[in-house]
Amino acid sequence: MKRKIVLAMALLGVQSLAWSAEITVAAASSLSDAFKVIAAQFEKQHPAVKVNLTFGSSGTLLQQLRYGAPIDVFASADQKTMNDAQNFFLIQNATRTDFTSNRLVLITSTRNPIIIKDLNELKHANIKHIAIGNPAYTPAGRYAQAVLAQKQLWVPLQSKLIKTENV
């Protein structure tokens, strides 16, 4: 995956390297671990270049881009946000590259005695809170909402949902 992201950085319009000693990468929070490693490797290979990393929800980063934030590379966690960036003419279409994918997972605390094998078990009275990314801002939240709605759990679980800014 790291090679794909490095390739993506090369393809995503890091053409300003000839004029600037800094590039700014805005990436989804879910990509933070990988991008920190990649940025360090990139800086090692290009000692004259400083990579500035900004992480957040894809929706928030898109808004920053829309309002003029100086972003050289934008890495969203989903197609919808990239489509929006393209529709708002915020990215160079020829540089857009799909380089990874997300997977929705359910995790529980080690202190939770309930082992969840089916999403319907989220209705269990002992489960008080369910944290998800806010569907208004995060792809993971939209994916969670879609799955819960498909299983007819979105409405029944509303009182338990804690919507977070990012993953």
Residue ranges with predicted function:
Residues 1-4:
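Positively charged n-region of N-terminal signal peptides that target proteins for export
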Residues 6-11:
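Sec-dependent N-terminal signal peptides
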Residues 13-15, 20:
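N-terminal signal peptide c-region/cleavage motif recognized by signal peptidases
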Residues 20-137:
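N-terminal segment of the mature folded domain
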Residues 33, 136-151:
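Bilobed "Venus flytrap"/periplasmic-binding protein-like clamshell domains
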Residues 45-54, 152-163:
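A local structural motif
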